Curated annotation (Swiss-Prot):
Substrate binds at residues 264, 321-323. This is Succinate--CoA ligase [ADP-forming] subunit beta. Keywords: ATP-binding, Ligase, Magnesium, Metal-binding, Nucleotide-binding, Tricarboxylic acid cycle. It comes from the Bacteria. Its EC number is 6.2.1.5. GO terms for molecular function: ATP binding; magnesium ion binding; succinate-CoA ligase (ADP-forming) activity; succinate-CoA ligase (GDP-forming) activity. Belongs to the succinate/malate CoA ligase beta subunit family. GO terms for cellular component: cytosol; succinate-CoA ligase complex. PROSITE patterns: ATP_GRASP, SUCCINYL_COA_LIG_3. Gene3D superfamilies: ATP-grasp fold, A domain, ATP-grasp fold, B domain, Succinyl-CoA synthetase domains.
Length: 388
């Protein structure tokens, strides 16, 4: 679960980290009033969406008058912002952040993720702030400096100083950087985060550090013990199909193709998308129904897949390990009949009672095509989309 920039900065401020004075606003009038609270300009106005690339899309602007603030708010509030990180529909702008402008001398980067290889929280710092860290990692990886947090000791001040020295910081900036590092690390651990990022962390013209941007990603599996983070969730920024899937414990990610995919197991789901692509098809989604593929969950999965108007056929790929394929077949038949599926459905069953499951599908009288193998399933669903 992602948070908005203004929410991330609220958490930063509570931990004593330096952030610009700013207010999240839902109306043009609130935006003007926020500017008055902040004081004399210039100000920075930012669209609040769960996506990067806002500046290039016109969603961030430096303004010098309240009239410009009102015009920016009137233009964006209630609209959708499209960036290189969103789909073609973009994301809704329900709030804008009005902040005091900052005089920037240098931009840095500081962030942390969970590194599954080392099983540690790893902090990354770079002198290349204001740039996507993925781009820095690809083009100039030597400019990214890392430290891993030992789970027994937790974050240590010397690690912050080590990163500061590698960034070429001196004097009071080393102390300030160490404070920011320790604050971020504590937020990461206490809030059960999966990602935390300040990009850029800037050195002002007065020689101080300030968190100019903030990005937080919470671990969805830990939200049950983070009630205040749950309250910060903005479902308007999420794909409604993904939100509906989460309610049924289905893992769904919307894609741009026209072949709906329903699979049990994340690895098998990725392999299914690969083989569909290999045979010339375009997956419309990733959907993992998990090990408990009951009739109810299969029915809900069909509803979610078919709510995408682009879907022209559905491929169901089930491996019966613990679950029995004949019971899965009953669920598929019931779901197709209940939902009223009007597109071809190709089903591949393998494993426990697969032959019995295939027979049930064949005898159902519904528009269900039983595939003999995964390759056959991919070929048949692609052919169905192409009208062959």
């Amino acid at each position: 679960m992602n948070l908005h920039e203004y929410q991330a900065k609220q958490l930063f401020a509570r931990s004593g980290l330096p952030t610009p004075v700013g207010y999240a606003c839902s109306t043009p009038r609130e935006a003007e009033e926020a500017a008055s609270k902040i004081g004399s300009g210039p100000w920075v106005v930012k669209c609040q969406v769960h996506a990067g690339g806002r500046g290039k899309a016109g969603g961030v602007k430096v303004v010098k008058s309240k009239e410009e603030i009102r015009a920016f708010a009137e233009h964006w509030l209630g609209k959708r912002l499209v960036t290189y990180q969103t789909d073609a529909n973009g994301q809704p702008v329900n709030q804008i952040l009005v902040e005091a402008a900052t005089d920037i001398a240098k931009e840095l980067y500081l962030g942390a993720v969970v590194d599954r290889g080392s099983r540690r929280v790893v902090f990354m710092a770079s002198t290349e702030g204001g740039v996507e860290i993925e781009k820095v990692a690809e083009e100039t990886p030597h400019l990214i400096h890392k430290v891993a947090i030992d789970p027994l000791t937790g974050p240590m001040p010397y690690q912050g100083r080590e990163l500061a020295f590698k960034l070429g910081l001196e004097g009071k900036l080393v102390q300030q950087f160490t404070k920011v590092f320790m604050g971020l690390a504590n937020i990461f651990l206490e809030r059960d985060l999966a990602l935390i990022e300040i990009n850029p962390l800037v050195i002002t013209s007065q020689g101080d550090l300030i968190c100019l941007d903030g990005k937080l990603g919470a671990d969805g599996n830990a939200l049950f013990r983070q009630p205040d983070l749950r309250e910060m969730r903005d479902q308007s920024q999420e794909d409604p199909r993904e939100a509906q899937a989460a309610q049924w414990e289905l893992n769904y990610v919307a894609l741009d193709g026209n072949i709906g995919c329903m699979v049990n197991g994340a690895g098998l789901a990725m392999g299914t998308m690969d083989i569909v692509k290999l045979h010339g098809g375009e997956p419309a989604n990733f959907l993992d129904v998990g090990g408990g593929a009951t009739k109810e969950r299969v029915t809900e999965a069909f509803k979610i897949i078919l709510s995408d108007d682009k879907v022209k056929a559905v491929l169901v790929n089930i491996f019966g390990g613990i679950v029995r394929c004949d019971l899965i077949a009953d669920g598929i038949i019931g779901a197709v009949a209940e939902v009223g599926v009007n597109v071809p459905v190709v089903v591949r069953l393998e494993g426990n009672n697969a032959e019995l499951g295939a027979k049930k599908l064949a005898d159902s009288g519904l528009n269900i095509i039983a595939a003999k193998s995964l390759t056959d399933a991919a070929q048949q669903v692609v052919a169905a989309v192409e009208g062959k």
